[in-house]
Amino acid sequence: MKKALAIVALVAAMFVAGNVQAQSTIYATYAPETFVAGSNSTNYQGFSVGFSQNIDLAKGIGVAAGAQFRMNMRNTTQTIWGITGKTNETQTIIDVPILINYKVAVNRDLAIIPFVGPMPSLALTGVTKGADPLFGENSYNWYGDNSNQSRFNLYAVFGADVKFTNFNLFGGYRLGLLDLDKTDNASLKTNGLFVGLGFTL
């Protein structure tokens, strides 16, 4: 709960900061994620929508703080002894990226803007649903009472934005820094690429 309140406080601070000369941008991204557990990895499809407010700190240097809603999804089908089972996994997340950026103006309309910074992340839901003719339907809550998986993560994010007038084409990488497995004998980390389109209001 304290972590959730901290993220809410960060988002509220961004709205306050919006009253100081700031540029607001809305965006959508394709953001697949890889879950790495020891030597095993599992790939999820991912998408997000969000907004950011960029505040100028000095000539060419700014900080963009925002919030985004992100979803990871994975569907699998497996047949054993003629019985086909299907599994659907879905995770929803709120991210709060806080990115330092440096604007390199190519001309009046075009700029290249590299960025880097932390991104606190809070998982809202995580569910695995399965169905097969033999056992019927079942589900597992990733964050239930008996779960060993943490909701909170902290990413290091870096990438670049190509801005043409009010349009943004950007991409980068996010690296999960925290071990999401609460036990001592296992580990779970996440990472992923992202590409997106944005519009500066």
What are these model-derived regions, one by one?
Residues M1-Q23:
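Cleavable N-terminal export/targeting peptides
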Residues V20-I55:
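Short glycine/proline- and aromatic-enriched beta-strand/turn motifs that initiate or cap beta-hairpins
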Residues P32-V36, I80-T84, N138-G144:
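Extracytoplasmic loops and strand-loop junctions of Gram-negative outer membrane beta-barrel proteins
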Residues V36-S39, T76-W81, D181-T183:
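Short acidic, glycine/proline-rich loop/turn micro-motifs
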Residues Q45-N75:
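N-terminal, post-signal-peptide region of Sec/Tat-exported proteins
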Residues S48, D95, T190-F194:
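Short hydrophobic/aromatic beta-strand or adjacent loop that forms the aromatic wall/cage
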Residues I55-I61, K86-K182, A186-L188, T200-L201:
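Outer-membrane beta-barrel transmembrane domain signature
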Residues Q68-Q91:
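Surface-exposed loop and membrane-interface regions of Gram-negative outer-membrane beta-barrel proteins
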